[in-house]
UniProtKB/Swiss-Prot annotation:
Its EC number is 2.8.1.14. Residues 397-417 are annotated as: Disordered. One of its GO terms (cellular component) is mitochondrion. Residues 171-173, 334-335 are annotated as: Interaction with tRNA. It comes from Mus musculus (Mouse). This is Mitochondrial tRNA-specific 2-thiouridylase 1.
Amino acid sequence: MSALRHVVCALSGGVDSAVAALLLRRRGYQVTGVFMKNWDSLDEQGVCAADKDCEDAYKVCQILDIPFHQVSYVKEYWNDVFSDFLNEYEKGRTPNPDINCNKHIKFSCFYHYAVDNLGADAVATGHYARTSLEDEEVFEQKHTKKPDGLFRNRFEVRNPVKLLQAADSFKDQTFFLSQVSQDALRRTIFPLGELTKDFVKKIAAENSLHHVLQKRESMGICFIGKRNLEHFLLQYLQPRPGKFVSIEDNTVLGTHKGWFLYTLGQRAKISGLREPWYVVEKDGTKGDVLVAPRVDHPALYRDLLRTNRVHWIAEEPPAALVRDKMMECHFRFRHQMALVPCVLTLNQDGTVWVTAVKAVRGLALGQFAVFYKGEECLGSGKILRLGPSAYTLQKGKNRTRVAPEASSDSPGLHPTS
């Protein structure tokens, strides 16, 4: 029966998606490879090498003897991913286009193309991730009717599919999948979920996929390529000159081309200064970038943030969080960073306060806080508000010691607000 199952696999021209397609073929499925063109390389002198990637994906299909299709989502990528990327930077935030690409392009545009145009029973990608469904359960989703209307039949049981971390914890990519819809996840297979990167390379070497094995792994944002992020952004955004200001004594240390070019935690390259300074705050009104002199300066550390309305993989918040309004779990805001123990506080509007057990370095507006409970990725929310830094709190304590009559009920950030 499995020989009749049709799986459409996204091919990037890299080793991971190539081996994913190979493994699906080995399982006896009817496999179709699809290459997505998401960026117009003609505008960027081929920075992303999209044409070469497409050729490599086509060659994979030839080696595996499977059909090849190419689709263009350049317009959709520009509207749903790149425009948001620029808008977020212009607001002084630090966006993650990879998360939005998976949400809007790979698991929406590509997913619907595979199912509606190619008649796929399931889709597959080369991501290092797992779900709570076995392959055969994924295929059964094709015949599971989605609830109609605003209210679900209370007798209908439709258990949500869980997004689980990959066996290779270092390569795990659930961070980038934390905004994927439940409907798309139900029909998705991740063939590499139980494998290590080294084993994937070994499979490629043993199956004549040398042309993708020899390619360097793509890192960073595709449409930027090897270029400097600041130079790239200034091609699209107007410069807004401002000052670098010391957070400790308000000394002006230098000038910059735009406060939106800097992310909290990064090193600020200030002309004429030999010692390193780091971005700790940004003042969009004045255009100033506040900096501190040490990589471990307390102004870099915070333990409180608030997100926008959280996208839960299961479509609804965990039952414990709904019941108690608070829940212990873990989160991260950068791929591959260590998971941070935290407490979530659920607000009525679906946003959450995140209180880290220990202050973390480099939290920035616009980043995604991705939540985990054990091996399960619960979902994510965009960071829209930050609590005070450890440096600000310390200054407040010092002022209180000097002026004990000062009120301790001054307004500020609090998880209940």
